[in-house]
Amino acid sequence: MSAVMTTIRVFDTTLRDGEQMPGVSLPLEYKIRIAKQLDKLGVDVIEAGFPSATKGEFESVKEISSLSLNAEICGLARIVKEDIDAAINANVDMVHIFVPTSRIQIEHTVKMSKEEIIEKSVECVEYIKSHGVKCMFSAMDATRTEVEYLKQIFKAVENAKVDIVNVPDTVGVATPFKFYELIKQLREHLKVPIDVHCHNDFGLAVANTYAAVMAGANEVQVTVNGIGERAGNADLAQVVMILHAIEGIKTNIKTEHLFETSKLVERLTGVKMPPNHPIVGENAFSHESGIHAHGVLKEYSTFEPGVVTPEMVGHKRRIVIGKHAGRYQIKKILEEAGYHLDDEKLNQIFEKVKEMGDKGKRVTDLDLFAIAEVVIGELKREEKAILVDEVTVLTGNKITPTAVLNAEVFGHRKVTSAIGVGPVDASLKAVTSLVGESIRITEFRMDAITGGSDALAEVYVTVEDDEGHSFTSRGAAQDIVMASIDAVINAVNYLLRMKRRKS
């Protein structure tokens, strides 16, 4: 095995390659928020964009460069003087130049011979270095490039004083064993640091990145949530936690910020992560099966990796109710919410949960509490903290979406209003403002459960208070605004009732 680096640098390309994901286009405000979050996370390099691509791209890279972040700011450029000048004029710390090196890429994308490519690459490296700026050189499509030519061009730019070379698996065709051998050969041939950039076309981006580190790579290119061209890139959280938790290899990443970073990028890009996404997915530390949940409640490492905990990545462990749930986990969840039951009532609740699950229904926290209250005879309208009598929503192409709610809150009449980016957002903000406590919506999901323009909408929301208590609730109606309001109010009511039970 090659000498593995004790500390690996993290090069994040969410704002460049990540934004190249179809359907993703980030305004400057969002790019700045993501850049600041990446800096908080501790990435070593932020590739802020491709400055020569558009005027807006140039301005965004320049703006991010002016933020005085701890991370180095990098701009992408072809081996073209105009591209390089644009990056330098955007005040980046590093210019990342690239050129095709595989036979298929050379034949179809550049009008130069192999020798001319080397000559031009060296010229560009020297030009960048003469301006006092760092330089990264990428041999595009490296994994389909003849190894000897790859060694030749990398050695040439190394002699020109390039700061780091990048080995990109541009079309995701590398496999871990082959990529390990390639990086090992290059590591033995070069003195300059090696960086890798892996695409996920065959689902191997993370594995290939890991293999490269074990072969002696110094730096890894990643994106938050693995977003990027086609099937995406190596996922930041997965790569970092494999290195940290499994191999004991250090990075400068503050892992407790991984989950919040994932959620921010998910929200700003509009790219929803699947719940089973490793490390940062909603279900990454969730347990429904009775056997698993029972074990985790006794000792978390029975059915979790153990070397990584939700706290390490800023996540939370969840015990979820469903048809696979066991009596023990149902009892624990109810006890934590202030419900104390004898065995007979617990068995009744257990059977009703199983019955709902067998009918294909998702059993939310509030479903469980409602079942419990029916069984023990406590479900009363007057116990609800919020009773909404009237909802008025205004929206339009020239009207700021506004919601007005007339409600009874803890027995007192209250009228409140809020504005939002849309009618649902405005309505949910109005609901949360009804309660004089810190309550926020951490998850919102909507599905159409019938067809047609008058489809029945089903909304799931998760609300959380400042003490970390959270509940998931559902609402259903033909009006998506009302479905959303119902779901949030149900969750808030039970959150407040749970607090009263515990007080």
Curated annotation (Swiss-Prot):
Domain Pyruvate carboxyltransferase residue range list: 8-259
Pathway noted in the entry: Amino-acid biosynthesis; L-leucine biosynthesis; L-leucine from 3-methyl-2-oxobutanoate: step 1/4
Known cofactor(s): a divalent metal cation
GO biological-process terms attached to the record: coenzyme B biosynthetic process; L-leucine biosynthetic process
CDD domains recorded: DRE_TIM_IPMS
EC number assigned by the record: 2.3.3.13
Molecular function per GO: 2-isopropylmalate synthase activity; metal ion binding
Residues involved in a divalent metal cation binding: D17, H197, H199, N233
SUPFAM superfamilies linked: 2-isopropylmalate synthase LeuA, allosteric (dimerisation) domain, Aldolase
Catalytic activity field: 3-methyl-2-oxobutanoate + acetyl-CoA + H2O = (2S)-2-isopropylmalate + CoA + H(+)
Alphabetic keyword roster: Amino-acid biosynthesis, Branched-chain amino acid biosynthesis, Leucine biosynthesis, Metal-binding, Transferase
PANTHER family reported for this sequence: 2-ISOPROPYLMALATE SYNTHASE 1, CHLOROPLASTIC-RELATED, HOMOCITRATE SYNTHASE-RELATED
Description of how the protein assembles with itself and partners: Homodimer.
Protein family according to the UniProt entry: Belongs to the alpha-IPM synthase/homocitrate synthase family.
Known function: Catalyzes the condensation of the acetyl group of acetyl-CoA with 3-methyl-2-oxobutanoate (2-oxoisovalerate) to form 3-carboxy-3-hydroxy-4-methylpentanoate (2-isopropylmalate).
Name recorded for this polypeptide: Probable 2-isopropylmalate synthase
